[in-house]
Amino acid sequence: ISSHVTIDFLKRNRPGKSVYLVGNSNLTGDFIKAGITLTDENPDIVIVGFDTEMTYEKLNKACNFIAQGKEYIATHPDVNCPLKDGFMPDVGSFIALIKASTGREPDLVMGKPYAYTVDYVTNRIGCKREEVAFVGNE
């Protein structure tokens, strides 16, 4: 859901802004389908999302753009993604690595339990904030 929340945020609050996306092909496809402009050169915003296809080149570009002061948004803060036989590093791990390299935390983090995500869910299902409970995997 965090990818949908991030896309919704961009469309409502950053229309027309270009994005450098750190994300796997599924996430990239979602952003393209939503009409988000993706670029490898001089983006307005860097989005760091779930990426099982991470490369050093992607990471290096993201760190350089973030160090230059580009707006930096993470799709969610989870450090690990649970698997049947353990876990794999998730976006929160990328956030820690990027902070070690650039000294910056994300300007905005989506996903649970952040307010924009709660509002997105309550608006989609038509209920009040106090009627919703989120269950996480961390």
Language-model features and meaning:
Residues I1-T39:
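Active-site phosphate-binding/coordination module
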Residues D8, A96, D119:
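Active-site phosphate/pyrophosphate- and oxyanion-stabilizing loops and adjacent acidic/basic residues
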Residues K11, P15-V19, T102, P106-E138:
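Conserved Lys-Pro-Asp/Glu-containing loop-to-beta segment of HAD-superfamily phosphomonoesterases
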Residues Y20-L21, I45-G49, I73, V135:
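Structural motif
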Residues I32, L59, L83-F87, Y120-T122:
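Short, well-ordered secondary-structure micro-motifs
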Residues I32-K33, Y56-D78:
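A short, gly/pro- and small-residue-rich
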Residues D40-E57:
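Short, well-ordered secondary-structure micro-motifs within conserved domains or adaptor modules
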Residues K70-S101:
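Histidine/lysine/aspartate-rich catalytic loop segments that bind and position anionic ligands
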